[in-house]
Amino acid sequence: MTGTGAGNKPLSHGLIIRWSDVFEPESILIEDPFAVRESILATRSREAVVSGLRQVELYTYVSKACGATGFSTGIAKFKPGAHLPYHAHKFSEAVTILEGRARVLVEGRVYRLGQYDCAHLPSGVAHQVENEDPEGELVCHWAFATSTPVRELIDRQFPIDDRGFGNPTSADPETIVRYESDAIYELSKDAFFLDLFARRFGAVGICGGHGRFLPDASLPCHIHDFDESITIIKGTAMCLVQGRRYELSDCDTAFIPKGLPHRFLNLSDDEMSMVWVYAGSEPDRRIVDAHYCSGELTWPGADLA
């Protein structure tokens, strides 16, 4: 499918899409000679996989279904007191807290995480996530180093070692990155970033972090050598991909394939923030001419730009 309007006509350059006007929940939105396609995954169109007597809702955004290679992303919503029982994966996972307070158990080691704190769980390490708030909802962003997300339940109990708001020791396989101001850097004017998981934090095949954009802030037009997922967790973002414009908010997620020029802007009067994830172990961006993002120049491909 190449469009979301009447008659399934291709979307014209410069069209701003608001999700209240979109009829198809998950559309492949471009058709070009390079066969490179972005997707916009709207929050209101996601269907939850329910766990634990409807206490935990798991939503998948980016995955093999939209063309992603080597990674997947989504969110999990926990009702008050709910938990996702011990499980493990055969790949890296990163869990970032978006709302609420989490209690994360890693083979008995217990950590408490607040907003934008992140836990990286290596392959094969059993872990459990709980909403320790008896009244409020817990919302987490998850990222897996596979395009086909799956969880293997672990029927085992571990002795408790409560670390509170502490961090793992050098002997522990997991990593906790706290959202602390001294680690935040200004990637572009008024755009402040914090790397939450990457190879240097133990992750294999994925990296990502949090980005906060003040009004009128933006990133320059750029490309990556790997696929990217961008989830807008606060405010409203404008996403430009080769002249196509998409408006995202409320955890709407953009999937940007490898080598496709794109940029994000905050054109609102309020702050905007995102969780970004790359299908690579360390972040890397290649700046290209802004006219490739605006659509004024035709993208020749990464090898020719």
Regions found by a protein language model. Name each.
Residues 94, 102-106, 110-164:
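Extended, hydrophobic interaction surfaces within ordered domains
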Residues 55-60, 74-89, 209-223:
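Conserved short histidine dyad/triad with adjacent acidic residue
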Residues 68, 123-150, 238, 250, ...:
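Ligand-binding loop in jelly-roll beta-barrel domains
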Residues 2-69, 151-205, 289-305:
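A short, N-terminal "cap"/entry segment at the start of jelly-roll beta-barrel domains
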Residues 108-122, 243-258:
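Short acidic-glycine-tyrosine-enriched beta hairpin
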Residues 90-91, 109, 125-126, 225, ...:
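A generic "binding-loop/recognition-motif" signal
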Residues 83, 118-120, 126, 218, ...:
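Residue-level marker of beta-strand positions
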Residues 92-93, 97-102, 226-228, 232-237, ...:
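Glycine- and acidic-residue-biased ligand/ion/polar-headgroup-sensing regions
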